[in-house]
C-alpha cells in the first residue's frame, strides 16, 4: 500500500499515521524518496494486523470524502477550469498554499512544503470564446458531409494500413468535442489547431481528386470564415482576470463561512451586472435567410445595412452584394430581423389602405358564396371583366380543388360548381333581357374576355355535374343514363353557343380595332393638314401688284401734277428719264385704252392706206 501525505485543508491528517501499530516506528515500513515535496510511505499489507487494516481503511475513506468535498467546492467556484475525476491523491492538482506537511516521518527527516503549479488565470473573454468555440463545433458537425470526420479513422475497416505511417498526429472532431467538454483546452487557439489538424490530415492522406479531400477543403473553409469572426470580436476586447480566477491563487485552508459568503455574493453581483446577450438559434437564422430570399426587391434600409456589414472582398460590383448570413453576429442578425419586420409592417399598412371588394355569387346566399378581397380601382380596370348585368369578376373566384379520396372534397366541388353554374346562368338570363344595353356599352376587349371566361368554366361545371350524377348510385340506372345523355347534349349545345359568342366577340373586337385604326389615321391626316396651314410663307405670290399700282398712279395723274413732280423730284426718283411732256405717259409707252365705240372703227383700221403707213407705236 502506498500512501501520500500532503497538507490537506486544516491539516486534518497531521497525526493520521500515528496508529497504535506504530506507523512511524514500524520496522517494515519503507520510506522512499520524496516526490514533489511529499513523502511516500510503503506499508506491506501482510505485516499489518486486522485492527490496523481497519484503522487504515477508515482513515483513507475519511481522506477520500474530504478530498471529494474539496474538489466539489473548487469545481463550483471555477466552472471552466479543469475538473479532475476521482483518482488517487497523487494526481490531484492543488492550489498554491495548502500549508506545511506535518506528518512525522521519523527522526532526522526534514519537512518540505507542498508546492503546486499556478493555474492559468481564466478571463471573462476566454470563457465567452470557449462558449463560441463550442457552438461553432456544433454547427460544423451538423454539416452534410462532416460525419466522415466525427470519429477516429479505423484503419482496419477502411483497409488503409499505411495511414499512421503518413499521418503522425491523427485527430477527429469527436475527440475535439470531448476535449472541449472536459475542459482540456486552456485557450481557443488549441481548439482551432486541433480542428485544422483534422482537415489537414484528410487533405494530406487523400489525393486532390478524392471526395474526402473536397469535403475536407469545403469544411475547412467553412470553419475558417467563422473562426475569423470570433477572432475579430475577441481581438478588440481586453478584460481583466475575473474574480473566479483570482480565487484560485488565494489560500483556501478551511475558509471561514463569512468570507465564503462574501466571495459568493461578489460573484453573483458581477454576474448580475453583465448584460444578457440575445442569441439567435439556427432555426431562426435559417428562417431569416428564407424570408430575405423571398423578397423580390430589397428596401433601402436593408441594402445599407448589408453594405455596412459586408467586407470589400464580398462586393462583386456596385449593385451586387454577396454576404453569408452565417457570418453575421447575433446582434446584427436581430437588427436585420427588426428591419425586415418593419418593412413587412409598412407593406401591410399600404395594402390595408385599399377598400375591400366583396364578391358575391348570384343565386346563392351564405358565407361560402362571397369572397372579400382588398383591391384598388386600377387593378379592376385591367384584370376584371363584368359578365352580365350585376356580375362580379370571375377571375377572383377560387379554383376548385378536386379531392377524389374524401367525400368532403366532392361536396365542396359540387357547391362550387353550383355557384359557378348559377353565375353563368344568371349571365345568360340577363343577356336576353335588361342586360342587353349594358353589354353593348362594354368595350369589345372585355366582351371577348367574358366569352373566354364563360367557355373556360363551362367544362368545370359540366364535369361537376357528371360527378354529382355518378355519386347517386342508388338511383335507377335508366334514369341516370338518360340524364347523362341529356347532360352530353346540353354540353354540346353549351359549347356551340359559347363558341358562337366567342366568334361574335372576336369579330366585334376586330371591327373595333379597324375603326380605331381608321380614326387614328384621320387624326394623323388632320394634324398634317393643320401643320401645312401653319407653315410660314416662303414666297409672296402677289409681289408684282405694286407695279400695277404705280402704273395706275401714272395713268390718273394730270399734266400740272406731273410738272410739279418733275420739278420737285430728283434725278434719283426715275421720273426724269421719261420724256412724257404733257401727254399721258401710257400713251407715250404705246398703251391705249380701247373703248366700246371704237369697235366699229376697227374694220377701217384693219386695211390702212399703203402710202400713209404708220409705224408701230406711233400716235397720229
Swiss-Prot record:
<feature type="domain" description="NET">
    <location>
        <begin position="270"/>
        <end position="351"/>
    </location>
</feature>
<dbReference type="InterPro" id="IPR038336">
    <property type="entry name" value="NET_sf"/>
</dbReference>
<dbReference type="GO" id="GO:0009737">
    <property type="term" value="P:response to abscisic acid"/>
</dbReference>
<keyword id="KW-0010">Activator</keyword>
<keyword id="KW-0804">Transcription</keyword>
<feature type="region of interest" description="Disordered">
    <location>
        <begin position="491"/>
        <end position="511"/>
    </location>
</feature>
<dbReference type="InterPro" id="IPR001487">
    <property type="entry name" value="Bromodomain"/>
</dbReference>
<dbReference type="GO" id="GO:0005634">
    <property type="term" value="C:nucleus"/>
</dbReference>
<keyword id="KW-0597">Phosphoprotein</keyword>
<keyword id="KW-0539">Nucleus</keyword>
<protein>
    <recommendedName>
        <fullName>Transcription factor GTE11</fullName>
    </recommendedName>
</protein>
<comment type="subunit">
    <text>Interacts with BT1, BT2 and BT4.</text>
</comment>
<feature type="region of interest" description="Disordered">
    <location>
        <begin position="1"/>
        <end position="35"/>
    </location>
</feature>
<dbReference type="InterPro" id="IPR027353">
    <property type="entry name" value="NET_dom"/>
</dbReference>
<feature type="region of interest" description="Disordered">
    <location>
        <begin position="597"/>
        <end position="620"/>
    </location>
</feature>
<dbReference type="InterPro" id="IPR036427">
    <property type="entry name" value="Bromodomain-like_sf"/>
</dbReference>
<dbReference type="Pfam" id="PF17035">
    <property type="entry name" value="BET"/>
</dbReference>
<dbReference type="GO" id="GO:0045893">
    <property type="term" value="P:positive regulation of DNA-templated transcription"/>
</dbReference>
<feature type="coiled-coil region">
    <location>
        <begin position="470"/>
        <end position="544"/>
    </location>
</feature>
<dbReference type="InterPro" id="IPR052442">
    <property type="entry name" value="Env_Response_Regulator"/>
</dbReference>
<feature type="modified residue" description="Phosphoserine">
    <location>
        <position position="417"/>
    </location>
</feature>
<keyword id="KW-0805">Transcription regulation</keyword>
<keyword id="KW-0175">Coiled coil</keyword>
<keyword id="KW-0103">Bromodomain</keyword>
<dbReference type="InterPro" id="IPR037377">
    <property type="entry name" value="GTE_bromo"/>
</dbReference>
<feature type="domain" description="Bromo">
    <location>
        <begin position="124"/>
        <end position="230"/>
    </location>
</feature>
<dbReference type="Pfam" id="PF00439">
    <property type="entry name" value="Bromodomain"/>
</dbReference>
<feature type="region of interest" description="Transcription activation domain">
    <location>
        <begin position="445"/>
        <end position="620"/>
    </location>
</feature>
Amino acid at each position: 500500500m502506498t500512501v501520500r501525505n500532503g497538507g490537506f485543508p486544516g491539516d486534518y491528517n497531521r497525526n493520521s499515521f500515528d496508529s497504535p501499530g506504530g506507523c512511524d516506528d514500524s520496522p517494515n515500513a519503507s520510506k522512499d524518496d520524496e516526490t514533489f515535496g511529499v513523502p511516500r510511505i510503503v506499508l506491506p499489507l501482510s505485516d499489518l494486523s486486522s485492527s490496523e487494516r481497519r484503522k487504515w481503511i477508515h482513515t483513507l475513506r475519511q481522506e477520500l470524502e474530504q478530498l471529494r468535498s474539496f474538489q466539489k467546492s473548487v469545481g463550483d467556484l471555477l466552472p471552466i477550469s479543469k475538473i479532475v475525476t476521482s483518482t488517487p491523491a497523487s494526481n490531484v492538482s492543488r492550489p498554491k498554499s495548502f500549508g506545511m506537511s506535518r506528518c512525522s516521518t521519523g527522526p532526522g527527516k526534514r519537512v518540505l512544503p507542498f508546492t503546486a503549479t499556478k493555474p492559468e488565470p481564466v478571463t471573462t473573454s476566454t470563457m465567452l470564446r470557449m462558449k463560441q468555440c463550442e457552438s461553432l463545433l456544433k454547427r460544423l458537425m451538423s454539416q452534410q458531409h462532416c460525419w466522415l470526420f466525427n470519429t477516429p479513422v479505423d484503419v482496419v475497416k477502411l483497409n488503409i494500413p499505411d495511414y499512421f505511417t503518413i499521418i503522425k498526429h491523427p485527430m477527429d472532431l469527436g475527440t475535439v468535442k470531448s476535449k472541449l467538454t472536459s475542459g482540456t483546452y486552456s485557450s481557443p487557439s488549441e481548439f482551432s489547431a486541433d480542428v485544422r489538424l483534422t482537415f489537414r490530415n484528410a487533405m494530406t492522406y487523400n489525393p486532390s481528386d478524392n471526395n474526402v479531400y473536397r469535403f475536407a477543403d469545403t469544411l475547412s473553409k467553412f470553419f475558417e470564415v467563422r473562426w475569423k469572426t470570433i477572432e475579430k470580436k475577441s481581438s478588440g476586447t481586453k478584460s481583466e482576470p475575473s474574480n473566479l480566477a483570482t480565487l484560485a491563487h488565494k489560500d483556501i485552508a478551511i475558509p471561514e463561512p463569512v468570507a465564503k459568503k462574501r466571495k459568493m455574493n461578489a460573484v453573483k453581483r458581477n454576474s448580475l451586472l453583465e448584460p444578457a446577450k440575445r442569441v439567435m438559434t439556427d432555426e431562426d437564422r435559417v428562417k431569416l435567410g428564407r424570408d430575405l430570399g423571398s423578397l423580390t426587391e430589397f428596401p433601402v434600409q436593408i441594402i445599407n445595412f448589408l453594405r455596412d456589414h459586408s467586407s470589400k472582398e464580398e462586393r462583386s460590383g456596385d449593385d451586387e452584394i454577396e454576404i453569408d448570413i452565417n457570418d453575421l453576429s447575433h446582434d446584427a442578425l436581430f437588427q436585420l430581423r427588426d428591419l425586415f419586420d418593419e418593412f413587412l409592417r409598412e407593406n401591410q399598412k399600404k395594402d390595408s389602405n385599399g377598400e375591400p371588394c366583396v364578391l358575391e355569387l348570384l343565386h346563392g346566399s351564405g358565407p361560402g358564396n362571397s369572397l372579400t378581397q382588398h383591391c384598388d380601382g386600377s387593378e379592376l380596370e385591367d384584370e376584371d371583366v363584368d359578365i352580365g348585368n350585376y356580375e362580379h369578376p370571375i377571375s377572383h373566384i377560387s379554383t376548385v380543388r378536386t379531392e377524389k379520396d374524401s367525400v368532403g372534397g366532392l361536396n365542396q366541388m359540387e357547391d362550387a360548381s353550383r355557384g359557378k353554374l348559377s353565375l353563368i346562368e344568371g349571365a345568360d338570363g340577363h343577356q336576353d333581357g335588361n342586360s342587353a344595353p349594358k353589354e353593348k356599352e362594354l368595350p369589345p376587349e372585355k366582351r371577348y374576355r367574358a366569352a373566354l371566361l364563360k367557355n373556360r368554366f363551362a367544362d368545370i361545371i359540366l364535369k361537376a355535374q357528371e360527378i354529382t350524377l355518378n355519386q347517386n348510385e342508388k338511383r335507377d340506372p335508366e334514369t341516370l343514363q338518360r340524364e347523362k345523355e341529356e347532360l352530353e347534349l346540353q354540353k354540346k349545345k353549351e359549347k356551340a353557343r359559347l363558341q358562337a359568342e366567342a366568334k361574335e366577340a372576336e369579330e366585334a373586337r376586330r371591327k373595333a380595332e379597324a375603326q380605331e385604326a381608321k380614326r387614328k389615321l384621320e387624326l394623323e391626316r388632320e394634324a398634317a393638314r393643320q401643320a401645312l396651314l401653319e407653315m410660314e410663307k416662303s414666297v409672296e405670290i402677289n409681289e408684282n401688284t405694286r407695279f400695277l399700282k404705280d402704273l395706275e398712279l401714272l395713268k390718273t395723274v394730270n399734266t400740272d401734277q406731273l410738272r410739279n413732280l418733275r420739278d420737285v423730284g430728283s434725278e434719283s426718283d426715275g421720273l426724269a428719264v421719261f420724256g412724257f411732256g404733257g401727254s399721258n405717259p401710257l400713251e407715250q409707252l404705246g398703251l391705249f385704252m380701247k373703248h366700246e365705240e371704237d369697235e366699229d372703227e376697227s374694220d377701217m383700221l384693219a386695211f390702212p392706206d399703203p402710202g400713209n403707213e404708220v409705224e408701230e407705236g406711233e400716235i397720229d
